[in-house]
Amino acid sequence: MSGSVLSLARPAAATNGHNLLTKQLNCNGNGTTGGAAKTTVASAITPPKQPQLAAKVIQQSQIVCFDVDSTVICEEGIDELAEYCGKGSEVARVTKEAMGGAMTFQDALKIRLNIIRPTQQQVRDFIQERPSTLSKNVKRFVSHLKAEGKQVYLISGGFDCLIAPVANELGIPLKNVYANKMLFDYLGEYDSFDINQPTSRSGGKAEAIALIRKENSDDSLITMIGDGATDLEAVPPANYFIGFGGNVVRPEVYRRAQYYVTDFEQLMGQ
């Protein structure tokens, strides 16, 4: 890889003596895609890990990839859609089982969507009535990245129809969005989802980044930012992972991440 880059050390252990507590925060940071401010869970005392070095990683990266749910936006899109369709508690039970390793990501996605079975009109109404809330300072950070000439991508296990308004709000072209696709029949009833999308299965974010690398220079420095384990596991082919805990702190991700921030402002070197 050309140029001087920071060494990619193994993820450091969590700082001793810090318990990962949670509290409710106002997540209406520097703009939303509409709607009222919402609250979300974040850590009360979780300190960032090496934020200055993380900012240097961003400075040296040519490509920056973001997770969407609980990272770029405050919410988890499929959970919000399930609640809107009156299936919140049923979907939450499946999500809990999936997090416990009882099923694959794709199986969990299939089961949850078969529970929700949103119509095309319900999805349109949901997007209109419950627009996603942008995380604090993310819009300013993305603008900063673009001003520096960096390419910005969104990589999500959520759905492109829910993410498109977010991408538009941030000025990210839809060709730079890797997400799942809902499929509807000719009456607008839910049919299935596209299993050919890389993010529809376990390891899909790494697959997406491999495709991004193939489209760009092989020696491009790629950084993935996200709150979850699937984001952490995108290295490799991503060069770096920066954990984000501005909305929710996942203890295992915090423990394993070498770099961790709780506000996108910490990555702007200010």
From Swiss-Prot:
Annotated SUPFAM superfamilies: HAD-like
Q: Please give the InterPro entries that the UniProt record associates with this protein.
A: HAD-like_SerB, HAD-like_sf, HAD_sf, PSP
Q: What is its EC number?
A: 3.1.3.3
The pathway is: Amino-acid biosynthesis; L-serine biosynthesis; L-serine from 3-phospho-D-glycerate: step 3/3
- Cofactor(s) demanded: Mg(2+)
Name the UniProt key words of this record, in alphabetical order.
Amino-acid biosynthesis, Hydrolase, Magnesium, Metal-binding, Phosphoprotein, Serine biosynthesis
Q: Active site: which residues?
A: D67 (nucleophile), D69 (proton donor)
The entry's cellular-component GO terms read:
cytoplasm
Residues binding substrate are E76, R112, S156, G157, K205
Main role?
Catalyzes the last step in the biosynthesis of serine from carbohydrates. The reaction mechanism proceeds via the formation of a phosphoryl-enzyme intermediates.
Q: What protein family does this chain belong to?
A: Belongs to the HAD-like hydrolase superfamily. SerB family.
Cross-referenced NCBIfam families, in alphabetical order? HAD-SF-IB, serB
Give the protein name, as stated in the record. Phosphoserine phosphatase
Q: Which organism is it from?
A: Drosophila melanogaster (Fruit fly)
